[in-house]
């Protein structure tokens, strides 16, 4: 796709047409559209891409349909541990948080880490305290409870005989390019249903789940986090573009549909270059994603047949 200003994703996985109600379909599409409209309005005001990706991800964090913020999954102890990261392609500044319990919008805390500390990554209780000190909305764990996620935890703890442990996708992310052709990326997640306490995936790891460099591309990944970390997936896409001259489409496809599966995992990504060319490769059956063009046209894609494997 070309002339894309902002793109978001709601996780890689499989969502066949007919597998959800019409009401749930509308909820997914409406959530993605709200995120796009919110970020697009900022870019139209002349604001930087960094503002747009933060705002878009905040909308998705506030939406219980996605595995981030309000809709985050439960760990094995029945709690939420939230991860997020954000990166500015203009100067490679970045911020990230992992394992936070009481921060309503982890993506905004990640930006605070970038702008108000000398660090890149903060974790756990210290990150939650930093949120309080910097005015990031603070909440109790009760805020994150949803019956759907609780039911998923119970199912994961009691799988059918011979069944595989259940995992949940729906990690969220955003990539954007502004009027100055500065690009940015952001990712936020609750991780895996029934994950061990303290587990951290790729979403808050700069270079694994999130990366942005004005010379190449802005990327937000989703999938099996442990393998995306091992494969340094997001940075690898950028490196292929930088060192070999590969297009965003070719570089992203090579990493997401060739390298990551060769390591034994699946997933997807949204990757946007400074010219507004968007790639959405995935090795899963589908990738929930949406984008908005310069003229304001919105496209949402949630079902597998709308996002054929690439």
Residue ranges and their predicted role:
Residues 1-310:
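Alpha/propeptide regions of enzymes that mature by internal proteolysis
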């Amino acid at each position: 796709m070309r002339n894309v200003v902002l793109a978001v994703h709601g996780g890689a996985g499989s969502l066949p047409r007919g597998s959800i109600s019409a009401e749930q379909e509308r909820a997914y599409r409406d959530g993605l559209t709200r995120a796009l409209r919110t970020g697009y309005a900022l870019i139209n005001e002349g604001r930087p891409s960094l503002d747009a990706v933060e705002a878009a991800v905040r909308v998705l964090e506030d939406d219980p349909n996605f595995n981030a913020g309000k809709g985050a999954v439960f760990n094995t102890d029945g709690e939420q541990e939230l991860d997020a990261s954000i990166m500015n392609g203009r100067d490679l500044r970045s911020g990230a948080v992992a394992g936070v319990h009481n921060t309503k919008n982890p993506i905004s805390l990640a930006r605070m880490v970038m702008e108000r500390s000398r660090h890149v990554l903060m974790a756990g209780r210290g990150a939650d305290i930093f949120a309080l000190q910097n005015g990031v909305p603070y909440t109790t764990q009760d805020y994150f409870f949803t019956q759907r996620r609780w039911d998923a935890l119970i199912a994961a703890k009691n799988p059918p005989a011979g069944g595989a442990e259940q995992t949940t996708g729906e990690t969220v992310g955003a990539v954007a390019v502004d009027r100055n052709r500065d690009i940015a990326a952001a990712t936020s997640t609750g991780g895996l249903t029934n994950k061990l306490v303290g587990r951290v995936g790729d979403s808050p790891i700069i270079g694994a789940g999130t990366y942005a460099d004005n010379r190449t591309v802005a990327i937000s990944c989703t999938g099996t986090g442990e393998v995306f970390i091992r494969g340094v997936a997001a940075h690898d896409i950028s490196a292929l573009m930088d060192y070999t001259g590969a297009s965003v489409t070719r570089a992203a496809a090579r990493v997401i549909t060739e390298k990551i599966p060769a390591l034994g995992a699946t997933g997807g990504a949204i990757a946007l270059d400074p010219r507004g060319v968007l790639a959405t490769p995935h090795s899963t059956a589908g990738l929930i994603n949406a984008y908005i063009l310069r003229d304001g046209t919105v496209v949402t894609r949630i079902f597998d047949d709308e996002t054929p494997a690439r």
